[in-house]
C-alpha cells in the first residue's frame, strides 16, 4: 500500500499538474479538476460523483501508478481524456471512443434531450444522422424516440467500426441501420422526417491554430476546405431530396456560421439559442430549402 497517497491528494496532484500544462478543455470536460476526477475515477473504477467518504481512501501502489500514468499522458501528450479511457459521455449515455472518431461534444445533444422541441413539433418517425462518427447522435435519438427508425452514415469505414460497436453496446441494432456513404450517395431513395448532422466544418486557418488536443482527432472529421463549408454546401443542396414533406434539417457549423450566412444570405437560417452559451446550429425545413433552392444552381 502507498503510505500517504490518498484519493484527495492524487486529485490535487492532477489538478495542479493540469493547471501548469496549458491544456485545452474542449472535449466534454471543463477544467483541470474535472479532468483529474475523470481520469482518477476511471483508473480506480469509482463513480464520477466521488462521494466525500472516498477522498481519504488510500489506493494501492499499482493504482496510484496508473493514475499518475494517465495524468502524465494527458499533460505531456495533450491527449484528450476520452481517448485515454476509451469512454465519453453524451446525452447522459456512455460511448466507446478511440482516435478513429471525434470525441462526442456536440450541443446537438441538448436538442435531443428536449426531443427537438419546439423546433420539430411532431415526433419524427425516421431520422438520419449524417456524418455520424461514433454514432452518438443517432444512438441518443434512438433513446429519445424509441418508435423511430434511425439511419446513421459516415464516409469513414474506421468511424463506422466504432459506431457499430456503440450500436451493439446500446442494443440498438434492431432500430438503427448503418451505411458507409459519402453524404447521401449510398442511401438510395429513402426519405426522412429529420436529418441531423455534425459534419466537418473547420476552415483551414482555424485548423492550423487549434489547440494540440484537436490534432489527436481524425482530420477527416474536422476540416472542410478554406471556409469550412465544403461539406455543408453539399448537404444544403442535396437534403431536400431526402426529406419528407414537413421534414427538417438540423446542422452544426460552429464557428463557420458567419461564413455560411455570408455565402447564403437569402436562406432563412434559424439559429438555435442555447442558454449554456453554445452556438452554431441551424434549422431549415424542407419547404424553406425548396423555396430557396436556386442557390444550388
Q: What residues fall within each predicted segment?
A:
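A general structural signal for well-ordered alpha-helical segments in protein cores
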Residues: 11, 36, 67-68, 134, ...
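N-terminal auxiliary segments of SAM/dcSAM-dependent transferases
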Residues: 2-91
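Active-site/binding-pocket entry motifs
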Residues: 45-46, 101-102, 201
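Short, conserved glycine- and acidic-residue-centered signature motifs
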Residues: 32, 101, 228
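SAM-dependent Rossmann-like transferase core, predominantly class I methyltransferases
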Residues: 54-147, 157-162
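S-adenosylmethionine
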Residues: 111-114, 147-149, 153-297
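Alpha-helix termini
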Residues: 21-25, 115-122, 171, 243
